[in-house]
């Protein structure tokens, strides 16, 4: 499926490349960190500066997965959330959420300043805007809730956008940045401070050392042995709690458009009505970009993701003056049932294991706050957000109901070149894809996490699990967990 723009994130394209070695020789550390996004790197940085020995293992390249594909808004304004949190959790817990995200945002600003990081950091006002007049009351209620929590929130009659809106909630002095440039600099600070970072190192298992209290983190034939382990992998794959039923995977399409102006919009924006769009300016090496995210959808539940890109491009061209599409990508995140992340130490059999997950699309501030909490817990320090983010709190068992493959076809002949589909052969489902020449190749269609049948993503040419959000390349390699093993090869019928 031909789509405009280069596949990939503009943030990754406009950041220095990293070249940390592969982990090949066993090691010991105070803390092992699995995952090199904003949670893992922030945790490692905090612990390194506190005097801990830290080893961080990243399956691919640091920062390039979820964080490097976000809209990178540094804000405690998360659309319409505070009125809902006050109603469901009470004023004090809502206040803790507000304080945690404000704290995370200010920590980033402090790192940019203190480490002299060049990452396109800019202060911007944040707007949650309404397309429909019926949503004005919800915006007013959210502003009132935000003010109860200490935010200087106000309501404006129209968002500063080139299309009509029905009012907007405004938080002043929020921020935006290039998350990849920030994380590359954070990784450099960790490495220069004595921390160890390894890339292209997929962890196979995390378990207690036999007969001991230390943890063993296994990658290929080597181990990191550590007193504490932090699982910062978007969704935890190991530990006594099954987060795959406590979290729901969701994706967004994103497109970056070339524009003749650096200020097509001034601010960071998110719509409160469906279909919602997230809007901000950015840039790459060739100049300014307008970056827009489309509406969310559950991973693996759409058999035509390419259509979502076409619809998003149409919406942007209808509402903005832009040129060609420069970049396009899909990002994945996980939602929690109460809109609050899970972060901190797992109790009981998980003692000494820490997680950060379920950021509900707001991982820049929430992920940083989670890292601050985890680092405090490891150091034995009190943290006021501990009870709010508690990863062992109760959750409904049916929050994530999973789904079925959206790519079932009745014959290989129905699969076009550069496309994929799932066929059934001798009671076994096969994931079949064709290269440009039309040559077919086959894999097992069973996700290696729990066996759900995968869906072909015709935009990214990936196999996506509709149950728990694992993603695989067209030839079966793991991109996102919770799966840790590739799709099994299979013979064509």
Briefly describe each language-model feature range.
Residues 49-69:
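Glycine-rich FAD pyrophosphate-binding loop
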Residues 137, 144-147, 169-227:
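Helical element adjacent to the flavin cofactor pocket in flavoenzyme catalytic cores
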Residues 2-14, 80-86, 109-185:
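Flavin (FAD/FMN) cofactor-binding and adjacent substrate-gating region
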Residues 29-56:
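N-terminal Rossmann-like FAD-binding beta1-loop-alpha1 element of flavoenzymes
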Residues 205-282, 413, 422:
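Flavin-dependent oxidoreductases
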Residues 1-31, 49, 477, 487-490:
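Extreme N-terminal leader/targeting segments of oxidoreductases
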Residues 273-274, 298-303, 307-399, 443:
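C-terminal catalytic lobe of FAD-dependent flavoproteins
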Residues 255, 424-493:
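Rieske [2Fe-2S] iron-sulfur-binding domain
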């Amino acid at each position: 499926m031909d789509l405009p723009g280069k596949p990939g994130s503009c943030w990754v394209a406009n950041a220095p490349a990293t070249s940390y070695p592969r982990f090949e020789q066993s090691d010991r550390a105070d803390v092992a960190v699995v995952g090199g996004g904003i949670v893992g790197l922030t945790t490692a940085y905090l612990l390194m500066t506190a005097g801990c020995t830290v080893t961080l293992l990243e399956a691919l390249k640091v920062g390039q997965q979820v964080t490097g594909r976000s809209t990178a808004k540094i804000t405690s304004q998360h659309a319409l959330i505070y009125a809902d949190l006050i109603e469901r959790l009470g004023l004090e817990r809502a206040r803790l959420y507000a304080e945690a995200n404000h704290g995370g945002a200010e920590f980033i600003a402090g790192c940019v300043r203190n480490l002299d990081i060049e990452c396109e950091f800019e202060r911007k006002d944040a707007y949650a805007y309404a397309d429909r007049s019926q949503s004005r009351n919800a915006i007013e209620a959210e502003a009132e809730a935000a003010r109860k929590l200490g935010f200087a929130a106000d309501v404006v009659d129209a968002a500063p956008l080139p299309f009509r809106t029905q009012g907007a909630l405004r938080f002043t002095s929020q921020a935006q940045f290039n998350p990849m440039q920030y994380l590359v600099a954070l990784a450099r600070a960790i490495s220069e401070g004595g921390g160890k970072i390894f890339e292209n190192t997929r962890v196979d298992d995390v378990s207690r050392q036999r007969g001991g209290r230390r943890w063993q983190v296994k990658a290929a034939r080597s181990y990191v042995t550590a007193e504490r382990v932090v699982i910062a992998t978007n969704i935890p794959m190991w530990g006594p709690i099954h987060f795959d039923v406590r979290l729901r995977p969701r994706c967004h399409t994103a497109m970056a458009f070339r524009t003749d102006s650096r200020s097509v919009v001034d601010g960071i924006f998110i719509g409160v009505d469906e279909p919602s769009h997230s809007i901000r300016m950015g840039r790459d090496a060739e100049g300014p970009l307008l970056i827009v995210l489309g509406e969310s959808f559950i991973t693996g539940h759409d058999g035509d993701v390419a259509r979502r890109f076409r619809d998003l491009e149409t919406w942007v061209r209808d509402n903005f003056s832009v040129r060609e599409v420069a970049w396009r990508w899909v990002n994945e995140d996980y939602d929690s049932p109460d809109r609050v992340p899970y972060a901190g130490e797992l109790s009981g059999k998980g003692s000494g294991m820490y997680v950060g997950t379920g950021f509900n699309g707001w991982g820049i501030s929430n992920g940083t706050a989670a890292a601050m909490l985890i680092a405090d817990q490891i150091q034995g320090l009190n943290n006021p957000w501990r009870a709010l983010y508690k990863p062992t709190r109760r959750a409904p068992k049916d929050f994530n109901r999973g789904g079925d493959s959206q790519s079932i076809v009745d014959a290989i002949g129905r699969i076009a070149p550069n496309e994929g589909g799932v066929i059934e052969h001798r009671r076994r489902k096969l994931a079949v894809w064709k290269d440009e020449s039309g040559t077919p190749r086959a894999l097992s269609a069973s996700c290696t996490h729990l066996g759900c049948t995968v869906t072909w993503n015709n935009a990214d040419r990936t196999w996506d699990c509709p149950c728990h959000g694992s993603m695989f390349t067209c030839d079966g390699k793991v991109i996102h967990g919770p799966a840790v093993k590739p799709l099994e090869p299979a013979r064509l019928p």
